[in-house]
Amino acid sequence: SVTYRTHPAPPVTAAFLVANTSTEEGRLQLFKEWVKIHPDIMDAGSAGFWPYSGTQFFLTLMAMGNPPTNPKATATLQGFYDKIATIPGVSIDLEVTKPYTGFQQWYDDNFIHSQNGIGFNYTIGDFSGVPAAVSSVLIPRTSFKTNTDDLAVALAELTDARPFLVGGGVVSKVDPDAMAVNPAFRSMLSDITIALSWNVTTATPQEVHAVEQTVTDWANGIRDVTKSPGAYVNEAEILIPNFQEAYWGNHYPRLRAFKQSIDPNDLLIVRQGVNSEGWDDEIMCKTL
């Protein structure tokens, strides 16, 4: 038998923005304002996606309730819109607030049936089924609060990224020791994902490695500011500098001890997995 626990599906209010920048200075100022208000957006009850590509900056955010249960949600976002509208070289091409009956309707309209979507087209804008090098950086709340300008510069240096405002709130209240993986989630606000693909039919191994190195170099630009190696293990980076701390933080020594005790011969081993530092990159030969 199976027991299901069900929950009500409350309505949600979604906010969509498309901003376009015509100058590098305007683009940088937009990022500075976004970084500055980032913690306030989360504290006011909004979460979601803020992809950007080339000259365009998008928001696809969602708050619980219709109207939002947090009375600051709408006003906080409007304050950001009003601020960036005054920046020379920045134009707001789309600004929409729309209620949905629940998360499922919002998801179906914007991720499944793209003809109903608003703003960034996730069906087209996010590629799948192609080889790609991926990186993830979990950006702590402290970076948004104390390294505002440096973080904005690092973000603006990326032409294309898919960040997710999914931290804070209840996420930050969970004991980081409650699970083995990703303790950095408890102090982060946004997870920025960077990806770059290659031609599967023509790329040489050297060219593939160059793509992987480029993605790591881009991610390092963010990590240099955050001083935090935290990364999302489901968006694993092939050349990540310190996978032990990135994925498991201070849990790693204990996890490695467990692994060595349970599997002393490394029968089960994967690249960048626990206790894999004693193997070569192809997990073919032991190096320690």
Predicted regions mapped to residue ranges:
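Soluble FAD-dependent oxygen oxidases
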Residues: S1-L288
